[in-house]
Amino acid sequence: MALPSFITKIKSRVEYEFKKTLYRNLVFKGGGVRGIAYMGALEVLEETGLLDNIERVAGASAGAIAATLVSFRLSAHETKQLFLSLDITRVPQTIDNGKKNRLPLSEENACTRRFFDRYGWYSSMYFYRWMESIIGLQCDGNRRATFADFQTYGFRDLYIVAANISRQRTEVFSAETTPDVAVADAVRMSMSIPLFFEALQFDGTQFGAGDFYVDGGLYDNFPTHIFDKEQYANWAFRDNINWETLGLFLRQEQSLQDREPEIPGDVWQFLTLAARNLYHSHQMSAYQTNPVDKHRTVEISDCGISALEFDIEPGSERHKQLFDSGRQAVRDFFEIDSRRSPRKKIVETIKEHVQAP
């Protein structure tokens, strides 16, 4: 027998309030330029009150950028403004900032030299300087703030994933594991898409020596497992799974089978196409075979936009589509009725149905 409608609504409200207070850890999947969708998702998480309860954030690649911004404990609007201060069109840089060539080089020649000397076509220097400046704004001018410094400032605990290709393993940078590493350094490594951006040698203190690192998404683009330890849960820890973790996962709007075939016109286009397929196949395979993650993950449509479309500008239709996609995905996950305030308490629902004439 079906439950009375008001009981069904009360049950739904209880489940909603439970979810809102359950989550303590937030994980962002990598996604390139599509990270703007996370800003839309954050707005709704804030509206529900869920964002206030988050204690730890983690991410790889673009997810590492989002996680770092969220760690500052700013409002969703302030976080979005910081994100929008990054000029995405300048991120793939052909000429390094502050460096002059002895001989005049065309941009293509500079990229070719970088590709053979530093194993990547573009420089990530513009992004790196932007990340340092954002951190400096939040850390009293200290652009080189470390993970330990972030703890001192009372930020959310931050976990950044990068791929150490010298040792063929994922490395997690955090106050627990690498307290003295500058956060900007870790984020730069995490977003360095192999072959697209220069590979980075890092010795734990500075670039230019040590192991080679690239985009964290190469090995682990959706690191929800980081928090699958009892120490990161208050009570909802069962069978080595932390149910207090919520993931934000950018998924492809179209399957690869439904897309028009892409025919590369040169070696660089081929490498870009191969990298995109590698990331997609590896991460989707891992996600689809993990039923646990599906139950603790908000799936956000990428609106058919590639991770490497660096020509997206704020205010454009594609930019708005991604932002709205993030908002709607969170609403769908929590089954939020846009006509009702997400902050209504269950007692109001009871009064509405029980005391109605």
Cite the ranges covered by each PLM segment:
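Gly/Ala-rich beta-loop-alpha elbow adjacent to hydrolase catalytic centers
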Residues: 59, 63
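Patatin-like phospholipase
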Residues: 1-58, 68-357
